[in-house]
A protein has these predicted regions:
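Catalytic cores of glycan-processing enzymes that make or break glycosidic bonds
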Residues: 1-243
Length: 243
């Protein structure tokens, strides 16, 4: 039943000790809102069928009933995903934490001129001319607006100055955002996971870093707890009566 799946996003996981960029599993996410309209019939049928063969079974990745790490299909890295569902932040909220916010500056992938050499080595100047463009006097962004990680990954290494190293560098630049914008919701911002390990974070002032820590801690460890609890209960309780 294709209508039950969101093919514009892929499921994955945020970074952990095993994967610094997170994971992108490549398969679509469930459209729980659609599933709920007919009482989760698709899930009920699955459970009923399994009950014909097993007395008990374990649901793997049970956290998927609470929330999923969703990544737009135009991206590859788990760093560019966010929890779904999740209560996104507004510009007003972000500023209330004391973090200086400009939508374009915070959501576009930007790399400081001082970091180009570290990312691209001796090819920095050529890469900058071909694949980047100035954002302001200090920062560069990707050369074209719709130049996403999937486009970068599709580049032919033999046709790119610096080959695979340059492609990896461009993939890294694509993750250099402060906030991920929720698909279809221009004013809904999610803090980029592990932003503290980005090149951009190093250019923040001490006060800006403290503000980021406050909003990041709230978003990832407090803000969505009640939402996820209610989401899981609304899905799991009806399914427990399936068999």
């Amino acid at each position: 039943e294709p209508s039950l799946f969101d093919t514009e996003h892929a499921a994955g996981s945020p970074p952990d000790q095993f994967s610094e960029n997170g994971q992108n599993w490549g398969f679509p996410i469930y459209r729980w809102d659609v599933m709920s309209r007919n009482g989760f019939a698709w899930w009920r049928k699955r459970f009923e069928s399994m009950a014909d063969y097993f007395k008990a079974f374990r649901i793997d990745h049970i956290l998927g009933f609470f929330r999923i790490w969703e990544i737009p299909v135009k991206h590859v890295s788990g760093l560019l995903g966010h929890f779904s569902p999740a209560i996104a932040m507004t510009e007003k909220e972000i500023k209330e934490y004391g973090f200086p916010f400009d939508a374009r500056f915070c959501s576009l992938p930007l790399v400081h001129a001082d970091d180009l050499k570290q990312i691209f080595g001796r090819y920095a100047s050529e890469v900058c001319c071909r694949y980047l463009r100035p954002f302001d006097s200090d920062y560069y962004t990707l050369a074209t607006k719709n130049f996403y990680q999937t486009d970068i990954a599709a580049l032919d290494p033999t046709a790119v100055v610096g080959g695979e190293d340059t492609i990896r560098g461009l993939m890294r630049v694509a993750t250099e955002v402060c906030f991920v914008i929720e698909s279809g919701k221009p004013g809904a911002f999610h803090p980029r996971i592990h932003f503290e390990k980005s090149f951009r974070y190093a250019h923040l002032s001490l006060e800006e870093k403290k503000a980021w820590q406050r909003l990041s801690d709230d978003y990832f460890y407090k803000r969505n707890d009640d939402l996820w609890k209610q989401e899981a209960l609304s899905r799991l309780i009806p399914l427990l009566s399936s068999t």
